[in-house]
Curated annotation (Swiss-Prot):
Positions annotated to bind sn-glycerol 3-phosphate: K124, G152, K207, D260, S270, R271, N272
Catalytic activity: sn-glycerol 3-phosphate + NAD(+) = dihydroxyacetone phosphate + NADH + H(+); sn-glycerol 3-phosphate + NADP(+) = dihydroxyacetone phosphate + NADPH + H(+)
GO cellular component: cytosol
Name of the protein in question: Glycerol-3-phosphate dehydrogenase [NAD(P)+]
NCBIfam families assigned to the protein according to its UniProt record, in alphabetical order: PRK00094.1-2, PRK00094.1-4, PRK00094.2-2, PRK00094.2-4
Gene Ontology biological-process annotations: carbohydrate metabolic process; glycerol-3-phosphate biosynthetic process; glycerol-3-phosphate catabolic process; glycerophospholipid biosynthetic process
The keyword Lipid biosynthesis belongs to this UniProt entry's keyword annotation: yes
Length: 357
């Protein structure tokens, strides 16, 4: 029997070059490349900006991103460039897939060329020291532009393989939401809308913490009961923290919350899961990071969120235990102990507050 592929069910997209959206993705990592490829497949006039000119030239010649997605052929219409001005001038939407530590610097560089373009973050993380989320940085560096954030359970290799997936575009602007949906929505990739920018962004950033925890647990061969407890208590931590930040806790019931948390915590494809597994296998953070060869946002997020949680007095035992394991030399089993302490608490505290237990 021939192997079934979802892509076999999909009709080719009819392209109208006169009305095609002009999309640029900044960042040539796995997720940025996957989104650029989706936009190109949907008939958008699509560029991807990559710092290294040789890599950009290689992608244009081979239509393969050999470093991040070596097993997939990219759309022939997708153009890679290394010149920032060329990448962002006269475009409709700029999708920014830059690691959080470089996000602000890249926005500063493109600021002189931004006129009416919408800027949408694809980055899941927080800026070190400032505790700024990517939407905060967009507002600070490009105060006049319409903006949004894209987040969801989006493992790049699955998207490239044509497996049905979904994501969330969050923006205060209905026009931005519609434009991003138009650019990326397809028969195999569904794009939902939200106006809770901070909630969607928090879900995407915070879940990286718990993917590290699940990776460590996998190295210890934890059972299904324990995995379920990590997932649900992680969701409780995320919701508590989000409320303190002004987000709607109900947002965490959607794709950008529990959906992203489930996918990232259960997939060996996740960078944060991989680095957790390496740590649980006895490697140091330096060794694990070197082996991975890509940025794992969860490590920085653990540091930033732990500090903010202490400042805001938010109860986050898993996050605190992870910090102690990674940075203070505590045994990894401390994470399991963090799930079991502090006695009688309610399961869903927005339904039954702790003081009523």
């Amino acid at each position: 029997m021939a192997e079934f592929k979802f892509t076999d069910l999909v009709e080719p997209v009819a392209v109208d070059k006169k009305t095609a959206l002009r999309i640029t993705v900044l960042g040539g990592g796995s997720f940025g490349t996957a989104m650029a490829n989706l936009a190109a497949r949907n008939g958008c006039d699509t560029m991807i900006w990559i710092r290294d000119a040789e890599t950009a030239e290689e992608i244009n010649k081979t239509h393969i991103n050999k470093r991040y997605l070596p097993d997939f052929t990219l759309e022939s219409s997708l153009r890679a460039v290394s010149d920032l001005e060329q990448a962002v001038c006269d475009r409709d939407i700029i999708l920014v897939a830059i690691p959080s530590h470089s996000f602000r610097d890249v926005l500063k560089q493109i600021a002189p060329y931004i006129t009416a373009q919408a800027v949408v973050s694809l980055t899941k993380g927080v800026e070190a020291k400032t505790f700024s989320f990517m939407s905060d940085i967009i507002r600070e560096e490009l105060p006049e532009v319409p903006y949004g954030v894209l987040s969801g359970p989006n493992l790049a290799k699955e998207i490239m393989a044509g497996m049905p997936s979904g994501t969330v575009i969050a923006s205060d602007s209905e026009l931005v939401r519609y434009a991003v949906q138009h650019a990326l929505h397809s028969a195999l990739f569904r794009v939902f809308g939200s106006d809770d920018v901070h909630g969607v962004e928090l879900g995407g950033a915070l879940k990286n913490i718990y993917a590290v925890a699940m990776g460590i647990g996998a190295a210890y061969k934890i059972g299904e009961n324990t995995k379920s407890m990590i997932l649900t208590r992680a969701l409780a931590e995320m919701s508590r923290f989000a409320v303190k930040q002004g987000a709607n806790p109900l947002t965490f019931l959607g794709l950008s919350g529990v959906g992203d948390l489930f996918a990232t915590c259960n997939s060996p494809l996740s960078r944060n899961y991989q680095i957790g597994y390496a740590l649980g296998s006895g490697k140091t953070l330096e060794q694990a990071s070197k082996e991975l060869g890509q940025t794992a946002e969860g490590i920085n997020t653990i540091v930033q969120v732990r500090g903010k949680a202490q400042e805001l007095d938010v109860y986050m035992p898993i996050t605190n235990a992870l910090y102690e394991v990674i940075f203070e030399g505590a045994p990894p089993l401390n994470i399991a102990l963090s799930l079991m302490k502090n006695g009688h608490r309610s399961d869903v505290e927005f339904v039954l507050p702790h003081h009523e237990v």
